Amino acid sequence: MDTSRLGVLLSLPVLLQLATGGSSPRSGVLLRGCPTHCHCEPDGRMLLRVDCSDLGLSELPSNLSVFTSYLDLSMNNISQLLPNPLPSLRFLEELRLAGNALTYIPKGAFTGLYSLKVLMLQNNQLRHVPTEALQNLRSLQSLRLDANHISYVPPSCFSGLHSLRHLWLDDNALTEIPVQAFRSLSALQAMTLALNKIHHIPDYAFGNLSSLVVLHLHNNRIHSLGKKCFDGLHSLETLDLNYNNLDEFPTAIRTLSNLKELGFHSNNIRSIPEKAFVGNPSLITIHFYDNPIQFVGRSAFQHLPELRTLTLNGASQITEFPDLTGTANLESLTLTGAQISSLPQTVCNQLPNLQVLDLSYNLLEDLPSFSVCQKLQKIDLRHNEIYEIKVDTFQQLLSLRSLNLAWNKIAIIHPNAFSTLPSLIKLDLSSNLLSSFPITGLHGLTHLKLTGNHALQSLISSENFPELKVIEMPYAYQCCAFGVCENAYKISNQWNKGDNSSMDDLHKKDAGMFQAQDERDLEDFLLDFEEDLKALHSVQCSPSPGPFKPCEHLLDGWLIRIGVWTIAVLALTCNALVTSTVFRSPLYISPIKLLIGVIAAVNMLTGVSSAVLAGVDAFTFGSFARHGAWWENGVGCHVIGFLSIFASESSVFLLTLAALERGFSVKYSAKFETKAPFSSLKVIILLCALLALTMAAVPLLGGSKYGASPLCLPLPFGEPSTMGYMVALILLNSLCFLMMTIAYTKLYCNLDKGDLENIWDCSMVKHIALLLFTNCILNCPVAFLSFSSLINLTFISPEVIKFILLVVVPLPACLNPLLYILFNPHFKEDLVSLRKQTYVWTRSKHPSLMSINSDDVEKQSCDSTQALVTFTSSSITYDLPPSSVPSPAYPVTESCHLSSVAFVPCL
């Protein structure tokens, strides 16, 4: 008689007594058999579950109940098992010894376990399968030997395991298939040999496993298969050969007539032959992506009526769409990363049941009509070369829910291309060439992506998308129709609609509100009100508007607006006045005057930039969102940004040159040396202009973009390239201010005490010092802003940053000429000379007036000339032309006490 049956028969009296006796087994025998520190609980009326896991045990507990059906000894320190350690556990069905330190299991270790069905020995240190310990466990159904160090499987180790259904041998060190050991496992249904070091599968390796349904061989080193290696696997439905080193298509699968799921992705297979799956008509799913496939036979996937999923990723050499005749039940088709340039017009006739189509990362240029694919729910065509979407491309796809057309070259979409897609909720058209967007038939969209279409600058009304939840637009201004600003505006209008009505109307509205509130419950009223508010804020739109992407006004706040207008007016008028007095004056232009005139000219460009921004703000007042994208991408914004940076940098460079010129002039005058030629100064001015042009051209060359914001200025935050550019500008300007400070400090220190009054009373020296001080002070907040952004200091609000960029940065452009006009006497002299010259020019245009009294006119002319020319014993160094420089008998740096002199001959 079978020993297992004998054990059960011997235990029947005890079971009958427990079942019919008055005392409860839970309170009697069962609980008395629970080892110390273990957790025990009843398993039905007569059996016990014992959990002794993770207790640090080094040996098996000895006082186990005979009625134990489940014993968990995993995660302990058990290193060995003695023969017959659990002799009385005839009812034990599951034994867990995982996560211990077992290196060897002796014969008889599981003797007496007649009912054992599940044995877990994973995560130990076994180097081979126990030769005799597992034999004759006739009830065993599941055996786990994974995550050990097994490199050898004895031929007879599984003999007697007639009930074994599941065998885990994965994550070991096997180098070959243990063919002899598997011959006794005729009832085996699932086996995994994954994560080993198997190189080859010989013929008839699984010849006696006729009941095997699932076989996992992934993550090995298999490079070859015997042509008959799968013979005998008549019931196999799942075969996993993924992540191996196969070089050729596994033609041995043709004998697997019941195969339903096949995976051999991530190998080195380069071709799939014609009629590759002719012997596998039951295939439902095939995964063979991430293979360097160069050739696929056109008939490779024909006549697979049960195939539901076909996935081929990374087949970079496929140029033709496969012929899928007879594979009419395909539901999911993925062919990505290939070079397919066209689709057959009959693709939907072959695949009428297709639900998911993924042809991303191909070279498709033109699309056929998918109208026959009535069951399509998802289409992914991103990263192709599609140029146009015709009216019939997606016509009558009533089940289509997701359509991805991103990263193509789509420039034309027929107005009714999406008009017959009632189920469409997700549409991705990002990174195309769209300049317009059709809205017909898209009222059910919940997700819409249009980002990257830089030519799409028009606003899209939120009323056309009542169900929309997430939208991505090319420009932040287009989110104003969906954002908080617009919602708040609507709410404000609703609450303020009756502000101008009469008191009687207000009382009527209040009465109506309270009457409606009385007619229904107050809580329902409040809930409805909250839902209305949430509905207004339900759409998530990106990129979101903000201070640098405004919805209504380019210059938010009247403080900034008035500041920009003031700077524009003062910079234009004052710099124009200074430039006119310097360059149109009949008096001789000294080097320092030339520099002041050039500085005024470049400062005028800053005034032009501020004036243009103020004009754009006025033109788009209250509706900047309608024009924001046009302004950012227009030539005007880039020109204004270029002029702003050029003018700012030129002003700093020229001011540095002026400070150095003053220092050199004092040095040469003190040493009775000849000054540098006037032409050299002009060359240096030209070099400063070229350097400023170079700095201003960097954003146009890709370092950053002037059109990144409507302010047309590189912002001191955001992309690293933009931040680096701004920091470079600040460092360069700081270096210039340092040079100016050193030059003037050296000038002061090198003067004798008696010369101080003469030098510091000179108007031009003091004027440059004043410019140095004001410009340096105004440069500090800009420098602080740039460096704080560099180290991620976020305590500065965007409004403050905007004020600094629009008001503080261009402020020197209007202060520089004002300081010259108000505090420099040379301006008054030049202005008087200009007025006299203008007067003479005007009189010369009217000869009748000149002939009234010619004698008086001649006398006035001579008097004027004599008034301009003053002979003195002091020599003038810089206010005379080079040809009239006298000998330096009395060297003076500049005309500190005398006016500028010009020699004009008397008429």
Swiss-Prot record:
LRR repeats lie at residues 67-90, 91-112, 115-136, 139-160, 163-184, 187-208, 211-232, 235-256, 258-279, 282-303, 306-328, 329-350, 353-374, 375-396, 399-420, 423-446. One of its GO terms (biological process) is oocyte differentiation. GO terms for molecular function: G protein-coupled receptor activity; protein-hormone receptor activity; transmembrane signaling receptor activity. The chain crosses the membrane at residues 562-582, 594-614, 639-659, 683-703, 723-743, 768-788, 803-823. CDD domains: 7tmA_LGR5. Keywords: Cell membrane, Disulfide bond, G-protein coupled receptor, Glycoprotein, Golgi apparatus, Leucine-rich repeat, Membrane, Receptor, Repeat, Signal, Transducer, Transmembrane, Transmembrane helix. Residues 25-66 form the LRRNT domain. Expressed in skeletal muscle, placenta, spinal cord, and various region of brain. Expressed at the base of crypts in colonic and small mucosa stem cells. In premalignant cancer expression is not restricted to the cript base. Overexpressed in cancers of the ovary, colon and liver. It comes from the Eukaryota. It is found in: Cell membrane; Golgi apparatus, trans-Golgi network membrane. InterPro entries: GPCR_Rhodpsn, GPCR_Rhodpsn_7TM, Gphrmn_rcpt_fam, Leu-rich_rpt, Leu-rich_rpt_typical-subtyp, LRR_dom_sf, LRRNT. Receptor for R-spondins that potentiates the canonical Wnt signaling pathway and acts as a stem cell marker of the intestinal epithelium and the hair follicle. Upon binding to R-spondins (RSPO1, RSPO2, RSPO3 or RSPO4), associates with phosphorylated LRP6 and frizzled receptors that are activated by extracellular Wnt receptors, triggering the canonical Wnt signaling pathway to increase expression of target genes. In contrast to classical G-protein coupled receptors, does not activate heterotrimeric G-proteins to transduce the signal. Identified in a complex composed of RNF43, LGR5 and RSPO1. Also interacts with other R-spondin ligands, including RSPO2, RSPO3 and RSPO4. LGR5 is used as a marker of adult tissue stem cells in the intestine, stomach, hair follicle, and mammary epithelium. This is Leucine-rich repeat-containing G-protein coupled receptor 5. It comes from Homo sapiens (Human). The gene is LGR5.
